[in-house]
């Protein structure tokens, strides 16, 4: 039988012997070590490489190798395409070769620039199961631990670009390396060949979380791997090989699959337009860390984004009813809840990537349609009819219909009093009564003191709400300006699973 010494001494070792890297990107590098345990130096006569197209091996390939000394080797995937099955066999003249094997699948690079005349889109999809009780109470469960993401681009191709791109799409299979063009950044100054660091003029959160980037200028591009980032400085795993001016753009890259179906329109014999959707690989998601700096009320975030008033805000009133319709004769109608549920259709315009990223962070915090938050209504709640001089829990308002507060769950239980000095005061309404002079008296949970009508800009209702759907589709006019349209559903009942003890004092 073999002993440890029989195996260990007078032997040659490779660490590791093989690597299954899965999906890789151009420029990826893999390392291994070779050493031997012979008592005298060993002569390496050569290295035989198979499957080496576009692959470079760096390290000692011949000569005398000292005993018990580790020799480092690096395999660089520079120009490989498709499946990679690379073997490096080390020949020591003993009649048997010692081999290192690398298996991988190279993602196809899609560096072609998109046509911004059709705005590119980035869609983030969560998945929430909503179970609704008879009275409208909801139980919501997030079914994905990570959202899925897709991007949609239009490519306009002319002349030789046309048939090259068409042939590329028609013959490609497997994964692709897709730039997130709307999230591009710019260099603060040019880059020279051999530079191991690049400096950016600005950085998006998605680029900061990337492992691979594309540097593109006109029809030239280079794929670089990120070792680390410190502010606006990016350290590369290996120096770049080309020169780029300050006008070059830096784009985060993601591994994705093209959708099952894409379309092309031939406007001329030499002019095609391709519309393609790419689904990012959900197992290789690289997303920015969530930044939670949102103000809270009753342990729930307050929705901080203002809708674009240049676009109409639509409000839909949904009444929860059970209707028995015999088709002949009278119908039987039963109201499941008191009042209607409002669904607000709002469009939000972002004028910087930082603003849009904050909205994305809020959606992630809510886990799509699962979480609850407070949102301002599009109109006013009511108006004060007189000043508040001394501390009181009651104040008078103009006739508003809030006297139905006890009979309906639809009226907002919280309000935000916005003052001209920029301050916002939150109040919780307990009830409202009618006065003989036509005004109404509102009783609040919090005391109010020294509040003049002339100091109040507006009083808006704060509805408990959630996103009505799990899809967040951002449309980019430029890399800075983007919009999203969302329906936001009012909730009549708070989720008791959310601990209200964490509420801030108002």
Predicted features, each with a name:
Residues 84-92, 178:
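Serine/threonine-enriched low-complexity regions used as flexible
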Residues 1, 97-232, 236-506:
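Extracellular/virion structural assembly segments
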Residues 48-65:
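Short, solvent-exposed loop/linker segments at beta-strand-coil boundaries, enriched for Pro/Gly
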Residues 30, 69-73, 440:
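Short strand-edge motifs at loop-to-beta-strand transitions and within beta-strands
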Residues 67-81, 86:
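Short, hydrophobic beta-strand segments
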Residues 2-38, 76-80:
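Beta-sheet-dominated interaction scaffolds and their linkers
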Residues 39-44:
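Short acidic/proline- and small/hydrophobic-mixed sequence motifs that coincide with surface turns
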Residues 76, 89-95, 447:
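Beta-strand-rich extracellular modules
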């Amino acid at each position: 039988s073999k002993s440890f010494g029989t195996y260990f001494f007078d032997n040659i070792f490779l660490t590791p012997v093989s690597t299954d890297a899965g999906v890789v990107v151009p420029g990826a590098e893999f390392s291994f070590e070779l050493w031997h345990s012979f008592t005298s130096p060993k002569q390496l006569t050569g290295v035989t490489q198979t499957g080496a197209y576009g692959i470079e091996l760096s390290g000692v390939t011949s000569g005398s190798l000292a005993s018990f000394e580790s020799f480092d080797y690096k395999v660089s995937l520079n120009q490989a395409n498709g499946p990679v099955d690379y073997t490096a066999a080390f020949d020591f003249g003993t009649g048997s070769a010692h081999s290192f094997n690398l298996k991988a699948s190279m993602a196809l690079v899609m560096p072609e620039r998109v046509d911004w005349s059709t705005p590119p889109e980035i869609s983030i999809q969560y998945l929430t199961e909503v179970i609704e009780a008879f009275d409208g109470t909801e139980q919501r469960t997030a079914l994905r631990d990570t959202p899925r993401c897709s991007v949609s681009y239009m490519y306009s191709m002319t002349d030789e670009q046309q048939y090259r791109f068409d042939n590329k799409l028609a013959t490609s299979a497997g994964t692709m390396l897709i730039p997130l063009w709307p999230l591009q950044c710019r260099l603060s100054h040019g880059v020279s060949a051999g530079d191991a660091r690049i400096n950016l003029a600005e950085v998006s959160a998605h680029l900061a979380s990337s492992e691979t980037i594309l540097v593109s200028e006109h029809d030239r591009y280079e794929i670089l791997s990120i070792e680390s980032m410190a502010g606006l400085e990016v350290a590369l795993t290996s120096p770049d090989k080309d020169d780029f001016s300050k006008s070059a753009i830096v784009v985060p890259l993601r591994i994705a699959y093209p959708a099952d179906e894409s379309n092309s329109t031939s406007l001329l014999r030499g002019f095609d337009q391709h519309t393609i959707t790419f689904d990012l690989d959900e197992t290789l998601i690289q997303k920015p860390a969530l930044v939670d700096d949102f103000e809270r009320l009753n342990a729930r975030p307050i929705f901080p984004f203002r809708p674009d008033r240049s676009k109409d805000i639509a409000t839909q009133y949904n009444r929860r009813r059970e209707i028995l319709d015999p088709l002949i004769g009278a119908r039987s109608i039963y109201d499941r809840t008191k009042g209607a549920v409002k669904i607000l259709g709002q469009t939000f315009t972002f004028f910087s990537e930082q603003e849009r990223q904050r909205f994305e962070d809020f959606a992630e915090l809510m886990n799509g349609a699962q979480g609850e938050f407070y949102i301002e209504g599009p109109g006013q709640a009511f108006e004060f009819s007189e000043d508040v001089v001394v501390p009181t829990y009651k104040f008078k308002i103009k006739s508003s219909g809030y006297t139905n507060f006890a009979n309906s769950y639809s009226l907002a239980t919280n309000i935000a009093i916005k003052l001209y000095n920029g301050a916002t005061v939150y109040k919780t309404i307990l009830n409202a009564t009618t006065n003989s002079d036509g005004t109404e008296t509102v009783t609040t949970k919090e005391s109010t003191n020294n509040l003049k009508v002339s100091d109040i800009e507006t009083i808006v209702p704060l509805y408990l709400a959630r996103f009505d759907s799990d899809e967040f589709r951002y449309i980019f006019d430029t890399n800075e300006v983007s919009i999203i349209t969302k329906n936001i559903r009012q909730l009549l009942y708070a989720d008791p699973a959310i601990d209200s003890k964490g509420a801030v004092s108002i």
